[in-house]
Amino acid sequence: MDLTGLLLDEEGTFSLAGFQDFTFLPGHQKLSARIRRRLYYGWDWEADCSLEELSSPVADIAVELLQKAAPSPIRRLQKKYVAHVSREACISPCAMMLALVYIERLRHRNPDYLQHVSSSDLFLISMMVASKYLYDEGEEEEVFNDEWGAAGGVAVPTLNALERGFLSAMDWHLYTDPREIFEVLSWLESCVAEQQGRWRGWYTYTDLCVLLEQPTWQLALGSLCQRLVKLSCLLAVAYVSSVALAVASVAVIHQSLGLSCIPTPGPPDLGLTSRCLLEPCIPSVPQCLPSLANVSSCLEGSMGLRSLWGSLLASLTPPPLPPPDPPAPPTLLHNCHLCQKLQRDSPTCHACLHPNRTVPTALSSPWYHTYGLAPPWPWSPVLLSLPQPQQCSLFSVMELARLKSFVFPG
């Protein structure tokens, strides 16, 4: 609360004319409401909640502060003594705050005085000097030294000596700027709010408002908010990065699995080509067909993981065996070493379209192919046209039988 708001009225002017007719200064009611709400004085005017004595939280703060300021073990200040003196001498909150200003001055100007005086005497004499400064002679709130002595249990001569020593230590500088009073009030409010919040275990709305007005709490709250914002940003970046990494990993794995089924292009295997051409006629068909089926299934398996596993299982499954051949008639026929069947025709095997003799490997290579077929490479889009199985000629079988009888007579 600003000091200007206390001295000026609602119109923003303050006139000395008719000053005696004012019961309160402008803004006094706001200050009283602030003290009652934040210093725990209470709102019941008819009960024992007036501003003529210190509240329990303020008394606790006063005891703690005066015990630290005057560490003498003689007549150590207690809360019961503070409550008794404040009730008997009608100590107001403003007198309490002014006394705290005086004690703070003594800590900086004359710390030796605080080492020799007891905390109880310091409380009594500081409250008495502050009350005399605020309430001049002729006011209803003035309290004489004998009344202060009776309230504090101190003789009047002793009390007078304590007063002279206190004024000497203060160097008679009792004037206090109102801004210092409001600074002490703000500090006292924060101490009370923090102490009561810790004692209860939770803070009220008023306590939080008081604490957030302090520069220390504002800096702490600002630093906490900045750290929370930084932590939130880091967590958001980490989350987005993890999601992007997971999506990229799934895409790369899926693409690699799809491409692994398709063989990479390379030079043709001449041995494989010649070996496929020299295989027997009937078994060669089911042995070459699975490789072509694997290529087509792999091409289709790149569209999905399910088809990929199906093609993998199909490639691992062995091809079905061909049906057994019917028993040959007991004739003297030659046995074709390529077709594994009895030949009855010319020496040329029409089933595999190759003569029944040793075929050079170089003729089966794709560079010397004379039939105009596409190269039998796995990556070629044109599939290798396989010859249709046919029965071997009877003349070739008879020729082989004659050759056998000639080589092995009898």
Swiss-Prot record:
Cellular component per GO, a single term: nucleus
Chain coiled-coil ranges: none
Regions crossing the membrane: 233-253
Localization, UniProt: Membrane
Protein family according to the UniProt entry: Belongs to the CNPPD1 family.
Family matches, as InterPro entries: Cyclin_PHO80-like (IPR013922)
Taxonomy, superkingdom: Eukaryota
Keywords per UniProt: Membrane, Transmembrane, Transmembrane helix
Species assigned in the record: Homo sapiens
Membrane topology label: Single-pass membrane protein
Entry-linked Pfam families: Cyclin (PF08613)
Protein name in the entry: Protein CNPPD1
GO molecular function: cyclin-dependent protein serine/threonine kinase regulator activity; protein kinase binding
